[in-house]
């Protein structure tokens, strides 16, 4: 019998082709986490029926429930503009829409607090967020696009007109949709003992972001699932996550209300 020693769990998450259709995990579906549990309960109840002897009893089946709780993880960027982090599938399932303009351009002219003409507006859409460079101290502010007409764009007002030329960047955006259409298959592998399990039809019911000036940004996801399975899938040969592990308080976070 193999005894587990050390952190030998691997977790993977992948968007399903349809609700409850178990996805096929690959090495690049890997996620880094501090704590993640897959949940499953039979919900059987003791029968109220009287029996001839007190030492015999039966239980009644109920609806089986399943779910997942990613209760602790550091939110690490991919390190590449336009490339989602390894939590991309979970964030898309939580918000409903993911767009990737993947645009790093400059402000060409007509710079105002509410808009400008860009060198290029390729890939932008109304509702996308953008990071602008403002002032001599190269302060950065985030805003949301209100209109896009080629390279001419307007946005929610910022504190001052952006620099000309100044950087205009829009990477990965998540937007609320009226319908959350994506479900997930979430896999757990114990590499030492060969144990594996998964939940399919997982829905992100709750997501939390935590920001502290003295700590790394953390994120939580949780929600119900259709069911739990232990067969029908295999562990990929590698565990490859996007980007690099957190190595200090670096980078910026922008939130547009």
Residue ranges and their predicted role:
Residues 1-257:
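Signature of extracytoplasmic/envelope-associated structural regions
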């Amino acid at each position: 019998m193999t005894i587990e020693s050390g952190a030998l769990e691997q977790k993977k998450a992948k968007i399903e082709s349809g609700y409850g259709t178990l996805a096929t995990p690959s090495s690049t579906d890997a996620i880094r986490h501090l704590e993640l549990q897959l949940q499953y309960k039979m919900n059987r109840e003791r029968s109220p029926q009287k029996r001839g002897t007190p030492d015999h009893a039966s239980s009644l089946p109920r609806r089986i429930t399943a779910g997942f709780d990613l209760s602790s993880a550091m939110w690490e960027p991919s390190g590449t503009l336009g490339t989602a982090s390894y939590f991309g599938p979970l964030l898309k399932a939580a918000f409903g829409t993911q767009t990737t303009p993947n645009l790093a351009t400059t402000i060409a002219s007509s710079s105002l607090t509410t808009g400008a003409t860009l060198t290029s507006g390729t890939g932008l859409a109304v509702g996308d967020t953008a990071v602008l460079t403002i002032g001599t101290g190269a302060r950065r502010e985030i805003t949301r696009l209100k209109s896009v007409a080629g390279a001419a764009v307007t946005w929610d007002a910022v504190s001052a007109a952006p620099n000309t030329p100044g950087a205009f960047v829009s990477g990965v955006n998540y937007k609320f949709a009226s319908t959350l259409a994506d479900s997930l298959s979430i896999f757990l592998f114990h590499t030492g003992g060969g144990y594996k399990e998964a939940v399919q039809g997982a829905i992100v019911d709750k997501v939390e972001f935590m920001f502290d000036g003295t700590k790394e940004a953390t994120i939580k996801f949780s929600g119900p699932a259709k069911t739990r399975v232990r067969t029908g899938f295999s562990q990929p040969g590698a565990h490859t996550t996007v980007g690099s592990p957190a190595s200090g308080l670096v980078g910026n976070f922008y939130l547009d209300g």
